[in-house]
Amino acid sequence: MKPISIAIDGPSGAGKSTIARKSAEKFGFIYVDTGAIYRTVGLAAYRRGIASKDSAAVIAMLPELHIELRHGPDGLQRMFLDGEDVSDAIRMPEISIYASDVSAVPEVRAFLMEMQRSFARTQNVIMNGRDIGTVVLPDAGLKIFLTASVEARAKRRQLELEKKGKSLPFEEVLRDMEYRDKNDSSRAAAPLRPAEDAVRLDTTQLDFDESCAAVESLIRERFAL
């Protein structure tokens, strides 16, 4: 029987990661956050002193990288760069822009494509990102496009950072969010857009539990789980 694959796409701060992780846990699926993979490439460039928009230098460093995505006993995803667990380091605010810029480089996307697709070949998976339903898993059994107003997404990101002990002014978080929205939707390589057959879900007025319930309902309905 062919494994079930579910694609959850959407802009930064829409709740993709937390909702996808919770849903994967609910149904016993593997969870893959592709954004964390791009953040790991961004972190590698940042640590090497490479400008985020220096595509040539970013491409040149790719053969040197050893990136691993592992799942712990708790099912949580951990990212490793050259053997180091960088799962927390990639969440630094300054890495967000790096991740957005390097993900716009076609060579970076091609470099990471096989890693992403390999997870869906032998196991049930919920994968979230920006081009999962359109490029990475175009044949996914269910495609969901999560969105919310940019203000709501910026507020969520600010609260998320505060929980990690990182306080940033709302205006700064909002500017970063608007920058990423523009960058992600206008890039030439796999721009952010809903797949034609994606179910669109606006979570602006929904809290976390309500958003999870809506996604889980879609999964149950589609796959009779």
Give names to the regions the model predicted.
Residues 35, 83, 112, 126, ...:
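Residue-level signal for inorganic ion chemistry
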Residues 87-164:
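ATP-dependent NMP and nucleoside kinases share a basic, alpha-helical "lid"
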